[in-house]
Amino acid sequence: MNSSNAIFKTFLGSAPEWYKLCIITFLVINPLIYFFVSPFIAGWTLVAEFIFTLSMALKCYPLQPGGLLAIEAVAIGMTSPHHVKHEIIANFEVILLLMFMVAGIYFMKQLLLYVFTKLLIVIRSKKVLSLSFCLSAAFLSAFLDALTVIAVIISVGTGFYGVYHKVASGSTFEDSTDISNDDKIITNKKILEQFRAFLRSLLMHAAVGSALGGVMTMVGEPQNLIIASQAEWGFIEFLIRVAPVSLPVLICGIATCLLLEHFKVFGYGERLPRRVWGVLARYNVLQEQHMTKQDRVKMAIQALAGIWLIVGLALHLADVGIIGLTIIIICTAFCGITDEHAIGRSFQEPMPFTALIVVFFTIVAVIVDLKLFEPIINFVLSADPHSQLALFYVFNGLLSMISDNVFVGTVYMNETKAALTSGFISREQFDLIAVAINTGTNLPSVATPNGQAAFLFLLTSPFAPLIRLSYSRMIYMALPYTIVLSIVGFFALEYLLPPLTELMTNWGWLIAR
């Protein structure tokens, strides 16, 4: 084997050869397009290539191919290291959240698995179970960050999967096994596939539920805080102003959840296999029998940490990541986890995704520097006031499907605030547009994993390959929700928001500025 073959073989490891050739081709053509064709076209080409690396997440983790594309983009001048640093600092809350909150949830896994195992055993109806996952995710996302909620759901799902996988592999509950290795599973493969489908559907219901709840309050999503700050809305005012759109969408989202389970379409409807239920029930009984006084104290501490988590985030007592760090300290200190390596394991899952998010911010910096969204933004702001709400909603939604919804919401909100300051639009129109931006960035963005950080975190988590949740499958399973949420949101924005906002202002519920 010569040197070039050896380099090609080690490049991107076990990724397919055609994929390696694609990435090499991208790296060759990008500078040529940038210097000899058009920086604008080169920018959109880079965005398309980065989305491609995300869609191939199960073939190769996107950090390496996406990172190489980002490094080259900086090297050829599509953006600067200074601007990348600026984007990272501007989104530092998200990085802190990923580093500490996800690790904090790791130390609450014992309590979460105990509670959700009880839930899974008691609720036998798949419709009720799906609805409970969707609604609990929606409720939690209204007060917590959607990423935190998804981290909880992933932790629980991994726990369920691990319990059954051990038994299916011929091991005991106490054995330490590699749950990514199916070699020892011979007779239970069909049941395992059914269980994977069951977990996929629950996870997708919860993921969409996090978007349904996240749109409702100013703390539900990072961009909501930016919108509330620019519009000078408090928690209650934000909730009331968005309600004419968010409530109809929530009701229709719940109906969609039930209909998908009833008709068993788009990958939904798979019930919990009876044998898996038996394994989980046996595991639950065994846990109860072997639970010591010390175990109960540990779970009580985790429960208190959970209460602090909800209260701290709902009242915004500190940044999300800082609260996550307090969870790590409280749970490890009072549960007796003081070994450095034991603590380090909690950071294994979030760190690769944190690095990927930083690469993503580099792509965002390219979008800003090359003004890729500027033609669309200018078109919307120059449109007739009567059609502005619809256009803001549609273009926010479309851009949020391919880019970070925090970035899209921030850019549109800054431009709209500038239009208000210059007297280009009225305050009443500004308030309505702010709602359109909020709902536009939060609802249609469920269409793809790149739209919402929580969805991207789910796709790139170690749990996704275990349950065979790929990029294309996520899009397919999210499709009915995307259609319903987007259409209902559009009509509520057009026909309910203006008259109900005027009515609530007349009632004194809203302040006319």
Swiss-Prot record:
Top-level lineage group: Bacteria
Major location (coarse): membrane
Gene Ontology cellular component list: plasma membrane
TM segment ranges: 21-41, 43-63, 88-108, 137-157, 202-222, 235-255, 299-318, 322-344, 350-370, 389-409, 477-497
One family name in Pfam for this protein: NhaB
UniProtKB keywords: Antiport, Cell inner membrane, Cell membrane, Ion transport, Membrane, Sodium, Sodium transport, Transmembrane, Transmembrane helix, Transport
GO molecular function per UniProt: sodium:proton antiporter activity
Topology of this chain in the membrane: Multi-pass membrane protein
Statement: the UniProt record of this protein carries the keyword Acetylation: no
Location of this chain's protein in the cell: Cell inner membrane
Reactions the enzyme catalyzes: 2 Na(+)(in) + 3 H(+)(out) = 2 Na(+)(out) + 3 H(+)(in)
Family to which the UniProt record says this protein belongs: Belongs to the NhaB Na(+)/H(+) (TC 2.A.34) antiporter family.
Its job: Na(+)/H(+) antiporter that extrudes sodium in exchange for external protons.
Protein name: Na(+)/H(+) antiporter NhaB
Species, as recorded: Haemophilus ducreyi (strain 35000HP / ATCC 700724)
Species classification: Bacteria, Pseudomonadati, Pseudomonadota, Gammaproteobacteria, Pasteurellales
